[in-house]
């Protein structure tokens, strides 16, 4: 891939952008109904369901709206009212979009729950939220049914499959249902109760308003290289619908997680473009075949997914014909090796982005694959989190809430007001029933993310790790991400996680847990080779003094490595050795 016209448009993009958030807004209206109610857009594809062994299913915006109207009537008959929490325990499928739309247009609150959750995780969330109803399928129905006795607020379960739930709902047989009157929600009204992934402790329910979806759009459009629209297009007027894009989106990110919901599903529908749904397990084969079959143009892939694809298909163009225009990645640092692979082999410059459940999509890149001549975009620096997206005032701050000098590590934080002094709509409303935790998230008007970074002279942020992931070894400050990225550059390493191992003399040793690539076996010789590899690229104090090979790293349901689990394991082992 060659760089064509590389200009830095970051400063003027931030200066020119102004938020226009309506007083009243509902996600269901913005993402579905406005497309379904017009004859020239009603039959546009909204959801394409991929099947590995059968033809794909296609559903239009009109079909989503008709089914959602019917489901809203059913939910109302079960006593669901505005403000109630409704649990949705579904994978990527057409009915998930129907369920979300139905709940939102009633003014109720969607509580997405992953099917990967075990009984304890589900019970905690159902009890903590006091959800009044659960929407399930044949996979999740039985476990939710068993929990109803311990979750008295849950009145019933509605099943999206014929053999699930207390009552079944067929989303495809609802074409004659009476229209549902859209609730008059304010943009600041609650829309989603989504629980944090729990990398640092018990999950907290973050209450997200409808307007947060609008707040995500600048980051989405930038990280997806303008999502198929012309950078020189004119601003929309009034109720005019966006047009001109032929984008097709797919991401393996679960739609029950902020990343899958706000970074893929909802923005795609908001712009009237289809998203591919796939509820099976991820694999490199699946990813390439799916993207080729459905001519996917835009995607959000975790670094772990990109690493797997790079290892499985070093030269994918020899086997697949892809139409990729943009790749966004988040969750962990991409690293130099994956960044270079995507440029050289996929023809796309990865746009890394950063955010969290509470303030999503606030920092990232907009590389435009090297063509920034039309006043849009800026260069992506390999390994950098990127810069603040338009509409967001981001800084690295110290413990007192003061901005850190260039190159000095601090907490990545988002200000309540953008650079023009306008309120930023991306903020969460607070943690569910936890006012103290909500208040502790802020220092003045700065919302702390708990992620450490440095900022360079050009405004690029460089990730240093979670505040609780960074540790000291022999007096040196160790950030695990840089060491992990270095390890993954070695052909034998599929994935890696670095944690402290307690040591009486040094305080901690640097320890790496390594998942080997196919064709490699654990050995003392390989340990020495990996240590030499890191020593040759990083500082001498950063190389892992100990390496343990494991089959898989502990991961959250959202694809993030749970270093905390490994760190606690090391602490437990050390305690047993202490006399």
Put a short name on every predicted segment:
Residues 214-298, 312:
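Conserved AMP-binding/adenylation subdomain of ANL enzymes
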Residues 43-101, 118-123:
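Conserved AMP-binding/adenylate-forming core of the ANL superfamily
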Residues 57-62, 191-218:
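Conserved AMP-binding A3 loop
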Residues 77-78, 101, 105-171, 518:
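Structural core segment of the AMP-binding/adenylate-forming
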Residues 117, 124, 134-137, 299, ...:
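AMP-binding/adenylate-forming catalytic core of the ANL superfamily
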Residues 43-45, 159, 164, 174-195, ...:
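Conserved pre-ATP/AMP-binding loop-to-beta segment of ANL
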Residues 387-391, 402-440, 478:
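Conserved ATP/PPi-binding loop(s) of AMP-dependent carboxylate-activating enzymes
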Residues 270, 296-301, 312-379, 393:
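Gly/Ser/Thr-rich phosphate-binding loop
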